[in-house]
């Protein structure tokens, strides 16, 4: 498994809405993530700085990257773009993080 972590932002007035939209996520999005080898996906909110810290374990980079090309992922991005900074393709602005320590 490949462990990934990344940071995104949520608009200051949208913390509760962000959580509501993820409680639960669309079943078809959950299915696509699992079909593409995503496991143990978690998102944490730093409410003071409006940051979202995400971790996920994936089976391969290629399968993970392929999620972005699915119709359901593109609909999800469009659904979320009004409550978080987004790129021109509607994907959330995110910064991948480098792992510097892990204890199993």
Swiss-Prot record:
Documented EC number(s): 5.1.3.32
Pathway the protein acts in: Carbohydrate metabolism; L-rhamnose metabolism
Primary residence: cytoplasm
Catalytic activity as recorded in UniProt: alpha-L-rhamnose = beta-L-rhamnose
GO cellular component: cytoplasm
Protein's cellular compartments: Cytoplasm
Binding site for substrate: 18, 41, 76-77
Keywords, ordered alphabetically: Carbohydrate metabolism, Cytoplasm, Isomerase, Rhamnose metabolism
GO biological process, one term: rhamnose catabolic process
Cited Pfam families: rhaM (PF05336)
GO molecular function, one term: L-rhamnose mutarotase activity
Catalytic center residues: 22 (proton donor)
Origin: domain of life: Bacteria
The protein's assembly and partners: Homodimer.
Family that this chain belongs to: Belongs to the rhamnose mutarotase family.
Function field: Involved in the anomeric conversion of L-rhamnose.
HAMAP family, A to Z: L_rham_rotase
Protein name stated in the entry: L-rhamnose mutarotase
Organism: Cronobacter sakazakii (strain ATCC BAA-894) (Enterobacter sakazakii)
Organism taxonomic ancestry: Bacteria, Pseudomonadati, Pseudomonadota, Gammaproteobacteria, Enterobacterales
């Amino acid at each position: 498994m490949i462990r990934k972590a990344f940071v995104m932002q949520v608009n200051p007035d949208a913390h509760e809405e962000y959580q509501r939209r993820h409680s639960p996520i669309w079943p078809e999005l959950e299915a696509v993530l699992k079909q593409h080898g995503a496991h143990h996906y978690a998102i944490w909110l730093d409410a003071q700085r409006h940051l979202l810290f995400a971790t996920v374990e994936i089976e391969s980079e290629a399968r993970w990257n392929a999620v972005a090309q699915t119709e359901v992922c593109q609909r999800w991005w469009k659904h979320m773009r009004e409550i978080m900074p987004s790129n021109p393709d509607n994907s959330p602005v995110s910064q991948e993080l480098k792992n510097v320590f892990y204890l199993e």
